[in-house]
Structure formats: C-alpha cells, structure tokens
Amino acid sequence: MKLLQYIFICTLILTANAIQAQSVYLTPGGKEEWLLNRLEIKTRTKQLSFSNFKPLNRKWVVNEVDKLDSLYATKDSTTKGLTELDKYNIQRLLMANSEWSKPKEIYIAEKSLIKGLYVNRANMIDKRNSDFILIANPIFNFQQGSKAGNTQSTFINQRGINVRGIIGNKIGFYFYFTENQERQPTYVQDWRNKFIAVPGAGYIKNFKVGGFDYFDVRGGVSWQVAKFMDMQLAYDRNFIGNGYRSLFLSDFSANNMFIKVNTYFGKFKYQNIFSELVSYRRSGSDRIYPRKYFRASYLSYQPTRWLNIGLFEGVMLGKRDKLSLPLFNPIMYTSF
C-alpha cells in the first residue's frame, strides 16, 4: 500500500503544472448508467460506444448527451428511436450535472422551502465560485418485496450521502457513504453462507433473520494530466466489459484502493488499473487481512459504431508475493 501512496505522490508532483480541469465519475450502478446503456442501444452512435469502461467520466457523459439532446431538438434521424420519456431523463441527467452542462433556466428552482437548499432543482446543495464547486445529495432507498411460498420478505434499507466537487478548477473529488440493511432472496443468502461474503460489500454483520448490515464507503480524487490523459486515485469499484456481468473485470467484488490511468487517442482508449485487494473474511481474532495486488490493462478500438475490438490483460500477485515493480509497467504483456 505504501508503494501505491509513493507512486501517487510522485505522479502528482511531476504533473502539478500540467493539471487541467477535471471531472469526477458517475456513481457505479446509478440511474445515469441505465440511461446511457439505453441511449447507446437506441442511437448506435460511436460517441456513446465506450461504455465498456465504467464508471464513466461525468464531463464526457454530459458533453455527449448534450449533443444528443441538440440532435433530438432538431429531429435528427439519429434520435428517431428516442421517446418523450428518454427526453425527460436526458434533461434530468443534464440538470443533475449542471457544473458541466449549458446553463438553462429550468435548472433553477423558483423558490426553495429551506434557504440555500435545492437552488438547483436536482441537487440539495450546489455551491460554486471561480475556485470551488461543491455538490451534495442525500441518498434514501427503501424497497420491500415478497415471494410466493416464502414467509420471509426481502427488503433494502439504504441511507447516506453523495458529495462531489472540483478544487481550483484542477482536482475533482467525490465521497459516497451509505448504511445498508438488506435481506436478499434465498439464493443470495445461500451464496453468502457458502462464501461468507455479500456481492459488492466488504465487512458485513448479521441483521435480524437472514439479513445483513454493512457500510458502503467510496471516495477518491481525479485530475487530468493532458488533453488525452486523466488519472484517478480512489477507493471504489471498476468495470471493464459489456453486459450486466463481465468476464474481464466486474463490480461484483467489494470496493478496493486503486490508481487508474485513462489514455485517449482517436478511436482508441487505453486503461490501466493498479489496485490492492483485501479479503474481509473474519478469522475470530484481530489480525491483518490478507492482501493481493492486481493490475488490469485494456485497449479498446472502435472502428465503426457497431464494432468494438479490445485486448485485455490481468496480472495478480498472491498474498504470499511481495509487491513487485513490474506490476506497475503500463505496457500490456511485458510485465512478467
């Protein structure tokens, strides 16, 4: 872990003069991703075809969706498959990310019940000046379900806060925190009992009968090194691939600490992720959790709107191995 910290500090110092305005990323699994997946399928544009890298950069998303919104207004053939509900969801996305979208009067509330809150209709707190932007929203998610023949109901009880911002027009930051109580369907409970883990969660504890309780904490900083490259240091999850689950890198695991480098050149995108993985299985005594170190590299090429070609490499160092410098070689297939 110390090596990751040293590399981050050295990189930040070396690139300090070149840092440009940088956005943070969309919340993994959020409703914005659902909308983008739909827009990619309905419009089939190359601009939205890099969604096999998640989470997505907010600034990039707003730029592309704003272009699509303009095409919809002119009834361009690209948007003929979109509905009025799609139009509404596009406006909601642009409103929620107004730090990057074009100013519109409909984004500003006529009046708010509490002074200073929901000045922007989509964000509870939206404070900004020439050097600082702060946006914060509460998180409330309550769901309950049932299944025929099962006396136990399923439920999700989630409360928390989501904060993001930009410092000095150069460093983007975000923080996401929720407290969660859940009782999942029987097959998920069986999986949990078998592997002593919950999909997407780290440390967990029992809650009532068949339920579990856990915190979901994420956060990080990001900065743009050059026009064609950005970097991120965060404690979160990543996704490389297509579909709900990926055979390359899925967000099925718990959050982990990582450094990520994205490089863009024409129709190519190259991503490197260097991360530390921690096993949260409890052994009944106080001890250091086992750790592994992992690097994922993915090169994506989008020659047409219907074809994407990718190369993937994953390197894992087991818990008995010491952290090795070749792991940080960003060139695919040359580390070991």
Where do the protein language model's features map onto the residues?
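Outer-membrane beta-barrel strand-turn architecture
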Residues: 128, 167-169, 224-227, 264-267, ...
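Transmembrane beta-strand segments of Gram-negative outer membrane beta-barrel proteins
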Residues: 28-41, 94-153, 165, 169-175, ...
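Outer-membrane beta-barrel domain signature
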Residues: 26, 51, 147-151, 206-209, ...
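Carboxylate/His-rich catalytic cores and anion/metal-binding grooves
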Residues: 161-203, 208, 304-313
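Residues on the lipid-exposed face of transmembrane beta-strands in outer-membrane beta-barrel proteins
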Residues: 161-165, 219-223, 233, 259-263, ...
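Signature for the C-terminal beta-barrel architecture of outer-membrane proteins
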Residues: 212, 238-239, 246, 250-336
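Bacterial Sec-dependent N-terminal signal peptides
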Residues: 1-24
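Transmembrane beta-barrel architecture of outer-membrane proteins
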Residues: 119-120, 137-139, 156-160, 214-218, ...
